[in-house]
């Protein structure tokens, strides 16, 4: 009887672990997003991180594993991870960006990728939000908990319009964020 109970418990635990492993953000490369935009335009969320960044690791473990967030971004956004110290060239909007100061022998921080600089990333983690044509909406730095990210994601998805004058966006954001009730 104990063996039967242990076997059932193990099977249930394995199934729960399998389900937890399946729920994850569908991270794409910039090239994959560029291609996907042709058939199904969406806004883009780009997580710019480094391997040595503690808050970046915390976001990966605590924020990007939230089931509500995963479901929302996989449905409404294309998601990209960009290592800001990545050594390889990246083509973005027809231009090639490199990391000319990358040192493969470096044990710690390394050269900053030109794409990270072009996107005005000055701290890690930074999430850069883009419209459907890969135009930057805003780079927003700092560790974000799921609810903090939810208000940004839903605002940019539901309220942002590139034709809205900048002076009208701040009052719109202030009102939206003050009335926002998170569900994650």
What are these regions (language model features)?
Residues 21-23, 120, 131, 137-184:
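Non-globular targeting/processing and membrane-anchoring segments
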Residues 25-27, 69-107:
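Thiol-based oxidoreductase modules, predominantly thioredoxin-like and allied folds used
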Residues 25-43, 73:
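A short beta-strand-turn-helix
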Residues 1-22:
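Bacterial Sec-dependent N-terminal signal peptides
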Residues 57-74:
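Typically the conserved alpha-helix immediately C-terminal to a functionally engaged Cys/Sec
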């Amino acid at each position: 009887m104990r063996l039967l109970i242990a076997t059932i418990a193990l099977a249930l635990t394995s199934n729960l672990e399998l389900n937890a492993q399946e729920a994850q953000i569908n991270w794409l490369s910039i090239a994959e997003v560029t291609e996907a935009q042709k058939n199904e335009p969406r806004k883009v969320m780009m997580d710019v991180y480094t391997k040595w960044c503690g808050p970046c690791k915390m976001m990966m473990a605590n924020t990007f594993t939230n089931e509500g967030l995963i479901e929302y971004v996989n449905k409404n956004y294309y998601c990209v991870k960009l290592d800001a110290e990545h050594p390889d060239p990246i083509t973005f909007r027809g231009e090639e960006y490199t990391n000319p100061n990358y040192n493969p022998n470096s044990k710690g921080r390394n050269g900053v990728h030109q794409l990270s600089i072009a996107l005005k990333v000055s701290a890690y983690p930074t999430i850069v939000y883009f419209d459907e044509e890969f135009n930057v909406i805003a780079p927003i730095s700092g560790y974000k908990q799921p609810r903090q990210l939810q208000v940004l994601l839903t605002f940019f998805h539901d309220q942002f319009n590139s034709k809205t004058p900048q002076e009208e966006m701040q009052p719109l954001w202030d009102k939206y964020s003050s009335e926002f009730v998170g569900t994650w």
